Amino acid sequence: MPITERWLLPEGVGELLPIEAEQMERARRVLIDLFHSWGYDLVVPPLIEYLESLLTGVGTDLELQTFKLTDQLTGRLMGVRADITPQVARIAAHCIQRKGVTRLCYIGSVLHTLSQGLGGTRNPIQVGAELYGHSGTESDLEVLRLALEALDVVGVKQVHLDLGHVGIFRDLVLQANLSPEEEYGLFNILQRKARDEIDTMLRNRDVGPQLRHMFMALTSLNGGREVLDEAEQVLAGSGVEQALTTLKEVATLTDKYLPRVPMHFDLGELRGYRYHTGLVFAAYIPGRGQAVAQGGRYDDIGQVFGRAQPATGFSMDLKELVTLGSSTTTTRLGIFAPWSEAPGFEREVARLRQQGERVVYGFPDTVSNYDELGCDRELVLKAKQWQIIEIRKLGRG
């Protein structure tokens, strides 16, 4: 193998160099502190699990995204997590088992077999928060507000919301009496907004004209708040009233607490349909087609772990947030400390580090590049006193 090929990383797999890594670590700390201030406890699930545990209660999409390997100790199949959300649901249902509301947050690397979108990463750093044990719009709103505040504290601005409710499609499917295979086929057609294909498929399955019209209407029920009023008329008598009421309540509360955040509604958008059960949302910024944060309600996932409970949450890619963020926070540069055995040198270095300063030793017989070391000051002994002098004032750098 040529030595140059040893430098290559797999396609879609990236690494962070010092500046980017420091920015990401700063963002990580800010987010964990934010989640803590809202009452969310940090959990750290394992990177790999037995495959049946990792994929329980999720759809085939996640299974296709999961790298699989054989455990050399047991011979059982294991998977490298592609999504931390199911792991946190397992922890909440099996390990913690609180009687009231449980709030958990997490951050960690995930691995995807394929990148999501052109030029996308296959090794995101997923960060998110989950709330268990409450099914009302209050918890939907809390999670939504926390997601938007998380974007704000890492410098992602000009966010607008896209809201939907997968319960509308699910309720219509039940009335149409479709099989799981037919439901999946209809789901794929709906994502393409192909009205004629929807009509043809449902006619072939003897679905009545009124219900066919409702399914086709989902392709065009998108826009501002007026869409919800239109949906009440178009979908009247279909049993989706509760879902529309939830959307209206969340929209009203969002207007109250986040009046400057634009909202868009799309009743045909079924993001995360395989495990979401109710309200779903995504956050977008101008000039970017992919969501920077997404979440929603997934009340059924705890049942497969032996404890059914309401659940809602969100997730985002920390590496992407750092790239997109416009935070003005700057890194304080360090102090260069040429190696010395003079009295008080080590004591002064220790004191500076305890104060939070970055102090970098300069070794004898080496050339020091202050920019590479990240230093703009130097520790100097003058008049038997250790002083901090700006490097530019010393005529260096």
Swiss-Prot record:
Pfam families: tRNA-synt_His. One of its GO terms (biological process) is L-histidine biosynthetic process. Pathway: Amino-acid biosynthesis; L-histidine biosynthesis; L-histidine from 5-phospho-alpha-D-ribose 1-diphosphate: step 1/9. One of its GO terms (cellular component) is cytoplasm. InterPro entries: aa-tRNA-synth_II/BPL/LPL, HisRS-like_core, HisRS/HisZ, HisZ. Signal peptide: none annotated. Keywords: Amino-acid biosynthesis, Cytoplasm, Histidine biosynthesis. GO terms for molecular function: histidine-tRNA ligase activity. It is found in: Cytoplasm. The keyword Signal does not apply. Required for the first step of histidine biosynthesis. May allow the feedback regulation of ATP phosphoribosyltransferase activity by histidine. Heteromultimer composed of HisG and HisZ subunits. Belongs to the class-II aminoacyl-tRNA synthetase family. HisZ subfamily. This function is generally fulfilled by the C-terminal part of HisG, which is missing in some bacteria such as this one. This is ATP phosphoribosyltransferase regulatory subunit. It comes from Nitrosococcus oceani (strain ATCC 19707 / BCRC 17464 / JCM 30415 / NCIMB 11848 / C-107).
